[in-house]
Amino acid sequence: MADLLLGVNIDHIATLRNARGTIYPDPVQAAFIAEQAGADGITVHLREDRRHITDRDVRILRQTIQTRMNLEMAVTDEMVDIACDIKPHFCCLVPEKRQEVTTEGGLDVAGQVDKMTLVVGRLADVGILVSLFIDADFRQIDAAVAAGAPYIEIHTGAYADASTVLERQAELMRIAKAATYAAGKGLKVNAGHGLTYHNVQPIAALPEMHELNIGHAIIGQAVMTGLATAVTDMKVLMREARR
């Protein structure tokens, strides 16, 4: 089974910084520490309201990240312009609502295939690999293929939020079937949202998974153990799940 990659989302380093309007903690320093600890990539979400990561952060990170930069962003003209200028290695297109605390669901690709095709094409034209953040739904997977995206990221929020063992098993099965279906269509399959040290291994064990993007749990654990240890511990769990 291929190695499973870990993308560390550092948005909440910026959340902590912005809570006091200071210049620390610095997302750039956090990215460096995460990479040194084994992160395979760094993910940041430049939201329309700039509530955590800022344009300046994105530009500096693009110049300093030594692995791969994954820019999460809404499907807007402004964000596409920024991405085409900065040229991160990856862009993950996500739905976005200003009032939400965090991304609440997957992107409705099936309802806007023409628009998504144009955006995917525009990003691809400048060398950016595009991922679509979608629910574990065959219809959305088919739409991602139609739009020309090489990657999808399966939204694992319902799995993470399941309140019973039976609910979690049902969500895991749904994700597993979607991952198999997507891989059969030629897509690279990533996953993320709500993954923690306690629930990551069943997702990590799915053979089709290429990369997991994890942020809040790692940054939360970093408060207790330090960022390097938090990243390393997550990598260990992911490796164990693949044995």
From Swiss-Prot:
Job of this protein: Catalyzes the complicated ring closure reaction between the two acyclic compounds 1-deoxy-D-xylulose-5-phosphate (DXP) and 3-amino-2-oxopropyl phosphate (1-amino-acetone-3-phosphate or AAP) to form pyridoxine 5'-phosphate (PNP) and inorganic phosphate.
Keyword Phosphoprotein listed: no
Protein name as catalogued: Pyridoxine 5'-phosphate synthase
InterPro entries in UniProt: Aldolase_TIM (IPR013785), PyrdxlP_synth_PdxJ (IPR004569), Pyridoxine-5'_phos_synth (IPR036130)
Cellular component aspect of the GO annotation: cytosol
Localization annotation: Cytoplasm
Class of the enzyme per the UniProt entry, highest EC level: transferase
Binding site for 3-amino-2-oxopropyl phosphate: 9, 20, 194, 215-216
PANTHER family from the UniProt entry: PYRIDOXINE 5'-PHOSPHATE SYNTHASE
EC numbers for this chain: 2.6.99.2
Complexes and interactors: Homooctamer; tetramer of dimers.
Active-site positions on this chain: 45, 72, 193
GO molecular function: pyridoxine 5'-phosphate synthase activity
Gene assigned in the entry: pdxJ
Catalysis performed (reactions): 3-amino-2-oxopropyl phosphate + 1-deoxy-D-xylulose 5-phosphate = pyridoxine 5'-phosphate + phosphate + 2 H2O + H(+)
Binding-site list for 1-deoxy-D-xylulose 5-phosphate: 11-12, 47, 52, 102
Pathways involved: Cofactor biosynthesis; pyridoxine 5'-phosphate biosynthesis; pyridoxine 5'-phosphate from D-erythrose 4-phosphate: step 5/5
Site (Transition state stabilizer): 153
